[in-house]
Amino acid sequence: SVMITGASSGIGAALARAFAAEGANVALVARRPDRLDQVRRDIEAAGGRALVCACDVSDAEGLRAAADQTAEAFGGLDVVVANAGFGVSGCLEALEMEDYRRQFEVNFFGVIATVQAVLPHLIRSKGRLGVVGSLAGCFGSPTTSAYNASKAAVMSLTESIYHELDEHGVSVTCINPGFVASEIRSVNNQGKYTGNPDPVPRWLVLPAERAAADMVRALHRRKPVVFIT
């Protein structure tokens, strides 16, 4: 069984469909139950099985409940992908400290909360953990200091826990995508969906389904790191 955070759209939804197509039972975790229900219906229409767990990754108790519910429903938990995140943008002088805190609360501390929630189940199954970083964590660029810093922190965290969890038989894969088709660039600094068009040229953007296929392959192979471009 597989649990994916940020599963209501973009990479998360594509991952859910990809795992379900392989026959995995999938738990869908995100804030928007209506969008999760749509992904669930898509999976079930294709003959798969999915469970909806409406939860924000800033809610540690909710994440633990989602992990326990998934393990109970599917008889264990084998793969978890910590994918939930959003992007704060703006020049340093224009952003408030609260903007940086909000960015790290979801992108960094949300990953920690997710890992802590699922870890007992993954240790039991000697499973696989995927953490979605970003190519943006490898460099700096104007107006994205909050997002880039949060993803750099995620990449460093993932490298550290890779070594910690290896002794438990749990593999950790740091997944670093470039531009992938998703709603992340249509979300404002408060994490709210705006519906604005993606400003990145379409020829630079990888289809979510293709990115998800590469990510699933890396998780099956228990690769420590993968770059998706």
Task: Show where each model-derived region lies.
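Conserved glycine-rich Rossmann-like NAD(P)H-binding loop of the short-chain dehydrogenase/reductase
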Residues: E22-Q38
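Substrate-binding pocket helix/loop in short-chain dehydrogenase/reductase
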Residues: C91-L92, E96-R101, K126
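Active-site helix of classical SDR
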Residues: V115, S150
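Residue(s) in the substrate-gating loop at a strand-loop-helix junction
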Residues: S134
